[in-house]
From Swiss-Prot:
PROSITE patterns reported for this sequence: GATASE_COBBQ
InterPro entries the UniProt entry points to: Class_I_gatase-like, CobQ/CobB/MinD/ParA_Nub-bd_dom, CobQ_GATase1, CobQ_N, CobQ_synth, GATase_3, P-loop_NTPase
Species classification: Bacteria, Pseudomonadati, Pseudomonadota, Alphaproteobacteria, Rhodobacterales
Family: Belongs to the CobB/CobQ family. CobQ subfamily.
Listed GO biological process terms: cobalamin biosynthetic process
The protein's name: Cobyric acid synthase
Name of the coding gene: cobQ
Record's function text: Catalyzes amidations at positions B, D, E, and G on adenosylcobyrinic A,C-diamide. NH(2) groups are provided by glutamine, and one molecule of ATP is hydrogenolyzed for each amidation.
Length: 482
């Protein structure tokens, strides 16, 4: 199990790279994260949801994403509450305190999923969440040491030297852990080093001396990480590309921002995620309103930031606007939530750029989907993950044929479009045509680029980590009889 000294130390990337490295060694590998918190969900073939990081790790391992790879997914809806997804299915919304009390039942689900994976594969790479040093969260924990103890697995602790203080991170974690948890950690590694590795030899040795743990490597910064699907939206914002400018307002409950990954990978495209407090730039080729875990709440947030004024001005200047899922709903005339599916019951006015109306009702739709463009008959693959149904005159100008039905809406001037289909930009031919309509060319093979980068990441870890030492730490897991 790979645990970190904090959030965003690179655990997900390490698991993806190690999964590809071990697969290249001929091992059957599966990724596993008992509990994840993310609104960036992936859809599995059976209509379940898991964290998108685990979907990338599954790809690295040569597997289709499966709900057992992330049995508990928390999708924040407010600062103190989240939708709880258990083994792919929505179990309801829980306040933080209620979730803490319900963890005992969730541990059973995580162990059940883990044991299924362990029975099917040579090795399971487990990713922790946050840090085991959060001692106030240890009771009832299912994300780090609580799971490691219940499953009987050894732990590799990873620190991040990029943010500074990595010696204190690792030694401090050693200090605050209970002796039984400390004993589970068998080794440490340092991630995201920049510069001459030999300069940290003394620091590495000091950590080993103070903790008694051996080092499995000091891993240099992997410069091509931006070519892989991002787990954090700011990883996308940090990469600047070409002249085609795609501007994205950073919604408070932004969801499924993986829609931006293929655009960010385009040499001709710069994706700019605009944080709160800043106006949307006036020189955008496209304003893309992304998905949201709280559409009505994020529409109010968008207005509070003044972005509604910026979007309408962009459209008046002749600019293009695309709304996906929640963003599509925001572009319409109104959103009606009679049952309080998205929050408090009520009806709100939309941005009015599409002549459509949304009603938040019915079952949640979670499915992988295959479509074709109505203009040009180009193949488009993606997924749907939404509540609500959208209808209205602009739906008569749908732009996708999705499994026998028309999907999406287009404004009368052709410059505003919306759809419930996430992931459509991973389809190279569609993305190239979309960018061509904006006046920019593309010949990028997105999937080939992701595969090549995973191979490069695996080689990077083989060079700088003691992968043999990691394999020696692995222990057989007794799988309970069903």
């Amino acid at each position: 199990m790979i645990q970190g000294t904090g959030s965003n130390v690179g655990k997900s990337m390490l698991v993806a790279g190690l999964a590809r490295a071990l697969r290249k060694r001929g091992l059957s590998v599966a990724p596993f994260k008992p509990q994840n918190m993310s609104n960036n969900a992936a859809v599995t073939s059976d209509g379940g949801e898991i964290g998108r990081a685990q979907a990338l790790q599954a790809r690295a391992a040569g597997l289709a994403p499966h709900t057992d790879m992330n049995p508990v997914l928390l999708k924040p809806e407010t600062d103190t509450g989240a939708q709880v997804i258990v083994q792919g299915k929505r179990r309801g919304t829980r306040a933080a305190g209620s979730f803490m009390r319900d963890k005992a039942g969730l541990l059973e689900a995580t162990l059940e999923s883990f044991h299924r994976l362990a029975a099917q594969h040579d090795i399971v790479l487990i990713e922790g969440a946050g840090s085991p040093a959060e001692t106030n969260l240890r009771k009832g924990d299912i994300a780090n040491m609580g799971f490691a103890e219940a499953a009987g697995v050894p732990v590799l602790l990873v620190g991040d030297i990029h943010r500074g203080g990595v010696i204190a991170q690792i030694v401090g974690t050693h200090t605050v852990l209970e002796p039984s948890d400390r004993a589970r950690i068998k080794a440490f590694a340092v991630n995201r080093f920049r510069g001459d590795l030999s300069l940290f030899d003394g620091g590495r040795d000091d950590i080993a001396r103070w903790t008694g743990w051996p080092s499995l490597g000091v891993v240099p910064w992997f410069w091509d990480a931006w070519k892989l699907p991002a787990e954090d939206m700011m990883d996308i914002a940090s990469h600047k590309g070409g002249a085609c400018k795609v501007v994205v307002p950073q919604l408070e409950r932004m969801a499924n921002f993986d829609d931006l990954d293929p655009l960010a990978a385009e040499p001709a495209v710069t994706v700019e995620i605009v944080p709160p407090g800043r106006a949307l730039p006036g020189d955008a080729d496209l304003v893309l309103i992304p998905g949201s875990k709280s559409t009505i709440g994020d529409l109010a947030y968008l207005r509070t930031q003044g972005w509604d004024i910026d979007i309408l001005a962009h459209h008046r200047r002749g600019g293009h606007v695309l709304g996906l899922c929640g963003g599509y709903q925001m572009l319409g005339q109104s959103i009606d939530d009679p049952e309080g599916v998205d929050g408090h019951p009520g009806k709100v006015a939309g941005l009015g750029l599409l002549d459509v109306h949304t009603v938040m009702a019915g079952d949640k739709r979670v499915t992988l989907s295959a479509a074709r463009t109505l203009e040009g008959d180009l193949p488009v693959s993606g997924y749907e993950i939404h509540m609500g149904r959208t209808t209205g005159p602009d739906c008569a100008r749908a732009w996708l044929a999705l499994e026998g039905r028309a999907e999406g809406a287009t404004s009368a001037d052709g410059r505003v479009r919306g759809s419930y289909l996430h992931g459509l930009f991973t389809s190279d031919a569609f993305r190239a045509q979309f960018l061509s309509d904006l006046g920019h060319q593309s010949d990028l093979d997105y999937d080939a680029g992701v595969e090549a980068t995973l191979d490069e990441l695996a080689a990077h870890l083989e060079q700088y980590m003691d992968v043999e030492g990691l394999l020696e730490l692995a222990e057989p897991i007794p799988v309970p009889e069903s």
